[in-house]
Regions:
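Primarily recognizes the serine-hydrolase "nucleophile elbow" in alpha/beta-hydrolase
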Residues: 1-49
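Mobile cap/lid helix-loop segments that gate and shape the active-site cleft of serine hydrolases
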Residues: 16, 39-71, 77
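Short, conserved loop/helix-junction motifs that constitute active-site signature segments
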Residues: 27-29, 72-75
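Loop/turn elements at helix/coil->beta-strand transitions in domains of secreted/extracellular proteins
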Residues: 30-32, 77-78, 107
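Cell-envelope and extracellular/periplasmic
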Residues: 39, 83-84
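Acidic catalytic loop of the alpha/beta-hydrolase fold
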Residues: 43, 86-90
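Short beta-strand/loop motif that positions the catalytic acidic residue
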Residues: 75, 81-83
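C-terminal catalytic histidine-bearing segment of alpha/beta-hydrolase fold enzymes
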Residues: 82, 92-99, 103-146
Length: 146
């Protein structure tokens, strides 16, 4: 599973928190990998966000519930974490921290820095067959086909 920006955030949350899968009667084994691009992995203090997103509401506990970083499973699936080298600084930092946390739990993690891509142009890489993301994504998926 994967996505860009909010889509990458939701994919990562689904990959590391199996409660959503349980709610729909789906085994965790269906998620064989996660490929977020320019995703948010953490909300709240220390996240680097300059303001609280409206969708979190006013409940402080919602930051934790919405943060893949705070919902990591004991054995997370493989991840290919990508972001642009000119992406928002907090997303670059969060991607690196999240990758390190996943590795500590034994996950197979690859990081891909998309040269000269901003947050917005990083999304285009997902559709460029000869671009910087597609070949790595295909190799990642083949490796984790199961």
């Amino acid at each position: 599973i994967g996505g860009h920006s909010a889509g990458g955030h939701h994919a990562a949350l689904l990959a590391v928190d199996d409660a959503w899968l349980k709610d729909i009667g789906t085994p965790r084994s269906v998620v064989r990998g996660c490929l977020p691009i320019s995703a948010v992995f953490e909300f709240g203090a220390g996240s680097g966000l300059s303001m609280r997103p409206r969708f979190l509401g006013t409940d402080a506990a919602s930051e934790r519930r919405a943060s893949p970083f705070s919902r990591l499973l004991a054995a997370p699936p493989p991840f290919l974490i990508a972001y642009g080298t000119r992406d928002f600084p907090h997303l670059i930092a969060q991607g690196a921290r999240f990758a390190a946390a996943l590795r500590k739990l034994g996950a197979d993690v690859e990081e891909l820095q998309l040269a000269e891509r901003t947050h917005f142009t990083a999304s285009y890489a997902g559709g460029e067959s000869d671009g910087p993301w597609v070949p790595d994504a295909l190799a990642f998926m083949a490796k984790h086909r199961g």
